[in-house]
């Protein structure tokens, strides 16, 4: 992938979600929810603080994260893959 996010932006790829219920029923349409877990593909250099210094991001390439899938999440197709561009503020947790 040949893309570099700016500042505190992070590029992530949503993980696949299980499409069967606990009872074995195949979920489709609105019943199949989108995963809020994703793999970090690229990170910006960091948040620029008021004094001009750059605060590095807490996430790194390869991390699995849980993110807030709402306003401010930008979906893009890059190299044929759908990725999301989000601010680090939209990342709720790193899965360890």
Swiss-Prot record:
<dbReference type="GO" id="GO:0005737">
    <property type="term" value="C:cytoplasm"/>
</dbReference>
<protein>
    <recommendedName>
        <fullName>Co-chaperonin GroES</fullName>
    </recommendedName>
</protein>
<comment type="subunit">
    <text>Heptamer of 7 subunits arranged in a ring. Interacts with the chaperonin GroEL.</text>
</comment>
<dbReference type="InterPro" id="IPR018369">
    <property type="entry name" value="Chaprnonin_Cpn10_CS"/>
</dbReference>
<dbReference type="GO" id="GO:0051085">
    <property type="term" value="P:chaperone cofactor-dependent protein refolding"/>
</dbReference>
<dbReference type="GO" id="GO:0044183">
    <property type="term" value="F:protein folding chaperone"/>
</dbReference>
<dbReference type="InterPro" id="IPR037124">
    <property type="entry name" value="Chaperonin_GroES_sf"/>
</dbReference>
<dbReference type="InterPro" id="IPR020818">
    <property type="entry name" value="Chaperonin_GroES"/>
</dbReference>
<dbReference type="GO" id="GO:0046872">
    <property type="term" value="F:metal ion binding"/>
</dbReference>
<keyword id="KW-0963">Cytoplasm</keyword>
<comment type="similarity">
    <text>Belongs to the GroES chaperonin family.</text>
</comment>
<dbReference type="Pfam" id="PF00166">
    <property type="entry name" value="Cpn10"/>
</dbReference>
<dbReference type="GO" id="GO:0051087">
    <property type="term" value="F:protein-folding chaperone binding"/>
</dbReference>
<dbReference type="InterPro" id="IPR011032">
    <property type="entry name" value="GroES-like_sf"/>
</dbReference>
<dbReference type="GO" id="GO:0051082">
    <property type="term" value="F:unfolded protein binding"/>
</dbReference>
<comment type="function">
    <text>Together with the chaperonin GroEL, plays an essential role in assisting protein folding. The GroEL-GroES system forms a nano-cage that allows encapsulation of the non-native substrate proteins and provides a physical environment optimized to promote and accelerate protein folding. GroES binds to the apical surface of the GroEL ring, thereby capping the opening of the GroEL channel.</text>
</comment>
<dbReference type="GO" id="GO:0005524">
    <property type="term" value="F:ATP binding"/>
</dbReference>
<keyword id="KW-0143">Chaperone</keyword>
